[in-house]
Amino acid sequence: MTHPKEALFGSGDNLPIIPSCEHFAGSEKLILKGFEMQKKLGPVFDITCDCEDGAETGKEVAHAEMIVRVVNSDANPYGMAGTRIHDFDHPDWRQDIDILVPGAGEKLAYITIPKSTSYEDAKTQVEYIQATAKKAGITREIPIHVLIETHGALRDVEKTATLPWVQVLDFGLMDFVSGYQGAIPASNMRSPGQFEHRLIAAAKAKVVQAALSNHIIPCHNVTLDLKNPYQTYKDAEKARNEFGFMRMWSIYPTQVQAIVDAMKP
């Protein structure tokens, strides 16, 4: 009898093996707390050191330099820390890359690109990261995560998923719902609406399909019920089992273990 692994068609490419959870931290204090949590729970989640929502206006340089310092420090126990830069329309996104890539490009787990409005936006930022890495003498491919949270990004998601160095497609719910200008009630940013509203469910399915068909990881948005780990668990479970997401964001410490538990194979 033929074994299923011999009979079933295989694409030849495997999905990246990365943690099923990433925890966002926007200040040095919270990043260091995240590292302490990694030491306690083990290497089961990444930490995203956030420039976009973390840097104070006028202090973008200092914030990026802080991220370089902590990522390279002994406080980073497993080398499982990435960063989110400013979006394409922000004047400092190139500056973020100019600081982060030469300073921590050998150690950053990934770079997340937010709020792209088209394939061309994402392509421009990916190419700038590649050029900056080459100029800095970094030979590794720095994994890139692209946040799909606008109409334009969703429209181009299949093409964006083919960009080099892209490892993850993140679905961003809040900006996506906001972009519908009231057509999707705000209550659908939470469960059960975030899984049941047809426009949101269709968008999530489209992101997952684009990611998996291009051998990259689809990542689910946060749970806004911050202090309810059971709700986080149920959201992660539904995202994994009913939509095919293989990773999920955390923005509150108690969400991490809930996501990891729900997304275990």
PLM regions: where:
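Expand to "…catalyze enediolate/carbanion chemistry for C-C bond making/breaking, isomerization
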Residues: 1-265
